[in-house]
A protein has these predicted regions:
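Short, charged recognition helix plus adjacent turn
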Residues: 1, 38, 65-80
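Short, basic-rich loop-to-helix N-cap that marks the start of a DNA-contacting helix
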Residues: 43-57
Length: 80
């Protein structure tokens, strides 16, 4: 799995845990719905830390909590 896929799955997982929609997350985090739709739709594999920080703020979690998931433990090497 690459980092983009892991970020996408983590966002969807956190929305499910919080019982909110992706659109609601966009609203509460100040990220545009199109940006979040691109991430969760797999059309953006290079999400910035700044965007992830905004999402974390909207979810009231730290960046550390965001990345504290099995999804990020065994990522593919990006540079070969």
């Amino acid at each position: 799995m690459n980092i983009g896929e892991a970020v996408k799955l983590r966002i969807l997982e956190l929305c499910k845990m919080r019982k909110i929609t992706v659109n609601k997350l966009a609203t509460i985090s100040g990220v545009t719905q199109s940006t979040l739709s691109n991430i969760t739709g797999g059309r953006n594999n290079s999400t910035t830390i700044s965007t992830i920080k905004k999402l974390c703020d909207g979810l009231d979690i730290s960046i550390e909590e965001f990345f504290c998931s099995e999804l990020f433990r065994h990522l593919e090497q990006e540079i070969k």
